[in-house]
Design a protein with these regions (language model features):
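A conserved mid-protein helix/loop that constitutes part of the nucleotide-sugar donor-binding site
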Residues: 25, 198, 202, 207-221
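Glycosyltransferase donor-sugar binding loop
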Residues: 48-49, 178, 203, 227-242, ...
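Membrane-proximal helix-turn-helix segments that form the acceptor-binding/catalytic region
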Residues: 84-87, 110, 133-151
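Nucleotide-activated donor-binding/catalytic signature segment of Leloir-type glycosyltransferases, i.e.
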Residues: 241-263
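Short alpha-helical donor nucleotide-sugar binding micro-motif in glycosyltransferases
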Residues: 259-260, 267-272
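Aromatic "clamp/platform" in nucleotide-sugar-dependent glycosyltransferases that forms part
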Residues: 280
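Short hydrophobic beta-strand element within catalytic cores of glycosyltransferases
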Residues: 297-300
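Conserved acidic donor-binding segment of nucleotide-sugar-dependent glycosyltransferases
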Residues: 315-323, 331-337
Length: 399
């Protein structure tokens, strides 16, 4: 008989609730919707002495795993203890997020749990992990996910093709979702001298692979009175942030408001002339999807993970090409009618295609397919997903 409600463990994020990064947003959005449907969800948060430790939030249970608060060790220690805790916990499904934490996904698997891994991006390619040990550990996590996960979820066609070509491993393509946001008038942003449509916005983590240096360099040579806002927090990338400030020191049009959230974040999205995401590497960029939901005209690098989100409802430039980025920015600055068109169509397009409610149902359907003696709820699954699950089950029975 099918189990109506499941006990689910989430592992691999920093902490929930938070906007520390895209993974934290994803875990929070999924967990609160799963709880609302009657499932039990436990998020295994990192321990941080400087952060409060509530036992729960919005019906989500919160556990805190030992974390070595030292650069390079926080993620790996929290991932190990998170997977260990989930392995010995009373859970039907353990959902591990990201390749690094997947290094330990064999622990809950060893204890008889069913394990789902979501690859949010090929993290070993990111600039911050480009030392031999870190990159190799993340790559090994990728290999552990391929070997031990009952189901492997990816967010883009490019990642799906990568796992097929590299490992011969079938994956499930289930992109992330985005809420439907209501734009708001400028109030708090006026403290930075910002008004509606008088600035270009980047909003995200301050790390080299996001390409903020391309944007600053392209912008510096544009004859415009529109400001450039580089909004985002700094964790392990203070040196890179200092480099960005040095690049912009002679241009008082460039503003660094730091980490933003709440009303200030909403106002920045709502009133930007255009939003720019110049990334070299992405998983599935939630900030890009949020910008479109708020009604931004978006300009992004042409990597698959961004271009597949935008499609024809935004503008792309060649990755890493500062001249092309400058030309595309100049064109948008000179054509407000084009910008208005993209703004008008972005919210309906992105929210229809990437509803969090639909995404949650698809994840739950995969969970049910992974729980022993249960069949997926096929009415919740697209035909392609049903076919993939059925094929995999037939292969297992045939062994």
């Amino acid at each position: 008989m099918a189990r109506k409600y499941m006990k689910i463990a989430m592992v691999g994020h920093k902490r929930v609730p938070s906007r520390d990064g895209g993974i934290e947003v994803v875990v929070g959005e999924l967990a609160k919707r799963m709880v609302a449907q009657g499932h039990s969800v436990t998020c295994h948060n990192r321990t941080d002495k400087q952060q409060p430790k509530p036992e729960g939030c919005n019906g989500i249970s919160l556990k805190y795993v030992p974390t070595i608060q030292k650069k390079g060790l926080a993620a790996v220690s929290a991932s190990f203890f998170g997977c260990l805790c989930a392995a010995f916990g009373n859970y039907d499904v353990v959902h591990v997020h990201a390749e690094g934490p997947a290094l330990f996904c064999w622990l809950p698997k060893l204890m008889g749990k069913r394990v789902i891994v979501t690859v949010h991006g090929l993290d070993w390619t990111r600039a911050k992990w480009q030392n031999g040990i870190a990159s190799r550990c993340i790559k090994l996590g990728e290999e552990m996910a391929v070997r031990h996960a009952d189901e492997l979820i990816v967010l883009s066609h490019g990642m799906k093709q990568y796992f097929a070509d590299t490992y011969g491993r079938e994956t499930l393509l289930i992109p992330n979702g985005v809420p439907s946001y209501q734009p708001c008038a400028p109030e708090l942003i006026r403290q930075y001298g910002l008004e509606k449509d008088n600035y270009i916005l980047y909003l995200g983590r301050i790390v080299p692979e996001k390409g903020e240096h391309y944007l600053i360099e392209a912008y510096k040579h544009l004859p415009t009175d529109k400001k450039l806002v580089i909004a985002g927090g700094v964790s392990d990338s203070q040196e890179y942030f200092d480099e960005l400030r040095e690049m912009a020191k002679d241009d008082d049009r460039v503003i660094f408001p730091g980490f933003v959230q709440g009303q200030l974040l909403a106002e920045l999205y709502s009133n930007a002339y255009t939003y720019v995401l110049p990334s070299d590497v992405e998983g599935m960029p939630l900030s890009l999807m949020e910008a479109m939901s708020y009604g931004c005209c978006v300009l992004t690098s042409d990597i698959d993970e961004c271009a597949s989100v935008v499609q024809e409802h935004g503008v792309t430039f060649r990755r890493g090409d500062i001249d092309d980025l400058r030309a595309k920015l100049a064109d948008l600055l000179a054509n407000p009618a084009k910008v208005a068109k993209y703004k008008a169509e972005a919210p309906d397009y992105i929210c229809h295609l990437h509803s969090w409610d639909t995404v949650t149902q698809r994840r739950l359907a995969v969970y049910r397919g992974a729980v022993p003696q249960e069949e997926p709820h096929r009415d919740l699954l697209p035909a392609a997903l049903v076919a993939e699950l059925a094929k995999r089950k037939s292969l297992v029975r045939g062994k």
